[in-house]
Amino acid sequence: MLYLVATGDYKGPSENHLSFTKGQRIEFLERTENGFIKGKLDGKVGIFPSSLITIETRPLSIIQNQPIKYSTETKDDTGSISSSTSTSTSSLTTPRAESSKDASGEQQPSTSTINGQSSSTSPILQSNGTTNTTTSSTSNNNIGDNISEKSFGDYDDTTSNHSKSASRLSVASFSTTTTATTTTTTTTTATSSKDKDKKDKKEKKEKKDKKSKDDDKSEKEGLYRKSKGSSSSSSSSSSSTKRRYANRKACEPWVVKKYEDIPEEVKSDMLKEDIPIKDIQDHFKLFLRILKFITRQKITLLIPIDPTIPTKEMNLLDLSDAESVAKSTTMFTREEIRTSAFDNVDAFVDAPIMDDNEKAAKTTEIKLERKRILTGISTEFLGQASTTIRVIPSSDIKKRIKFTHMVGRGQYGKVYDALYDKKRVCVKVVNYSTPKEQHNVLQEIGFLTQCDHPNILKYNCSVLYGSDLFIVSEFIQGGTLEQASASSHVFKETQVGFIGLELLKAISYLHEKKLIHRDIKAANVMVSTDGEVKLIDFGLCASVEKGGSQHMVGSPYYMSPEMIRGEECSYPSDIWSFGICILELLFKKPPHRDSRMKAMFYNAINGIDFPKIRCSIDLKDMLWQCFESNPEKRSTVDKLMRHPFFKRCESKSQMKSVFTDMFSTSSKNSISTTGFF
């Protein structure tokens, strides 16, 4: 008998639905259609959404529509059918689907460790609480380096990543498994060998990480990432060079009351930012907020309780001295600098949790719940998105998906020009193993499935293969608006008008559905040789009605002032980002391109400097409506679409020739490093 645990409250809308509260145990009976599960609770039989149940931290919100397989007999060595001597019963398994087979169709054994005991990479959770073993294989995450120019057949399906398998939160399916005693013995022997290899690899990794931390110690001390082996003097590149900021999340938290309290190495780097210190002092809290967003540095700001306290007396406090810190508690209130309403996750983690693994799992769970709140989605939303994921046998997948060349590479995956069922498509390959990875992918898929508009990328389906997910979408022959802006072509205002109007149509569609994109930028807009303009990348999309409005997300150059300042954000934020895209088309780069910090800082306090914009009066007026600092006075998308500027834009047929000339000569291996969607 298999039991499931409810991860949330659910009230059935009809009599054939079960109702339960978080933490209740539900007896599993069978899986039904549309992501629902049939179970038994307190003697009542009914259905409920799979997104609200879990078993040993493996949520079933991503259950696939795979048939339930029952097997009560096994073949012995002589080939005859005999009853199994294993104690295995009906169980829940985390599949690697058919992808666990190699090219010959045979499964290869692979092991990992769960709760200190050896097991297969696909642990079977039995009804009696014990762990059995099956044989499986983990696919190589570096799929981009193993895909042939002509076909999928050269994909290297190895077991090199078996150590990651224990923590994987992957698409689950139901099956019953029986294992012969001889198989269990063989697997146990293999497990011992694998555990030894795993231990050796872990020790090597720890040594490598320690060395890396020692080598990069100076990197964490400053504001910027330093190239390996470079000195501090060599790191002072020119202002025209795009700088890479250091990730200071693991650095010592700051407690500051003024700019002078910031560490010297950071203040030294700030001299390269071309931001006057006086401006930073006048907008110190805003500066700290931007600094936290860019570097993830933990910061606490001390604010005077009594404004009449002399500034000189406050400045004499040495925050590195224990006595001064104790005195500061009577003079200041402490305010943690945040980029969202739920920044401090540690405050929500139960204090009694002592085990590091349990605490890490709890922290991850809280972070994902926080993200769902801020984007206005639910576990049901993710469960519905997971129903578009397909599990195809490896023998068929190599015939149905054929990769050609890579057309894009981003932070979360690679994009390939491919054939799916003999139809040309784009396939984005992403890791799909950890809870965070799965949550992010399902969130994007969920919003894409809600959209059906000619100016928004059309999502087809997703295919699970090992620990990777292939996100299949329509193929677009062309490139990004960022690539178009950086080309030698100089856009006329009439051409800018066509692109802008098409993009506004996509934004209008989202706003009508009570959604905001929150990451509109030139790299997230595709233009095709057919004269089409499509909005892509819905990873930061959110619901206006259900989501949190105070959350700092997006791309620094395109971020609206209200989002940078920590105010409530809604539809006007997308309008601001749209305006920056228009400026990039006109001037080939967004304002303050040389520094993300400078762009965010001055966009938040000064807005856009209109006198420097040389264009027609109606275009300048349209941009003025986009860049109104007060979001309540900023134009709406419908009002912008009726603006006179867009009445003189070029036609689709005219733009078709422009985009064809722009992208027809580009190499097939030319990629956009900013991502695809």
Curated annotation (Swiss-Prot):
Residues 209-224 have a biased composition (Basic and acidic residues). Pfam families: Pkinase, SH3_2. The lineage of its organism: Eukaryota, Amoebozoa, Evosea, Eumycetozoa, Dictyostelia. Residues 72-244 are annotated as: Disordered. The keyword Amino-acid biosynthesis does not apply. Its EC number is 2.7.11.1. ATP binds at residues 407-415, 428. This is Probable serine/threonine-protein kinase mkcF. InterPro entries: Kinase-like_dom_sf (IPR011009), Prot_kinase_dom (IPR000719), Ser-Thr/Tyr_kinase_cat_dom (IPR001245), Ser/Thr_kinase_AS (IPR008271), Ser_Thr_kinase (IPR053235), SH3-like_dom_sf (IPR036028), SH3_domain (IPR001452). It catalyses: L-seryl-[protein] + ATP = O-phospho-L-seryl-[protein] + ADP + H(+); L-threonyl-[protein] + ATP = O-phospho-L-threonyl-[protein] + ADP + H(+). It is an enzyme of class 2 (transferase). Belongs to the protein kinase superfamily. Ser/Thr protein kinase family. STE20 subfamily. Keywords: ATP-binding, Kinase, Magnesium, Metal-binding, Nucleotide-binding, Serine/threonine-protein kinase, SH3 domain, Transferase. Residues 1-58 form the SH3 domain. The keyword Transferase applies. Residues 401-646 form the Protein kinase domain. Its cofactor is Mg(2+). One of its GO terms (molecular function) is ATP binding.
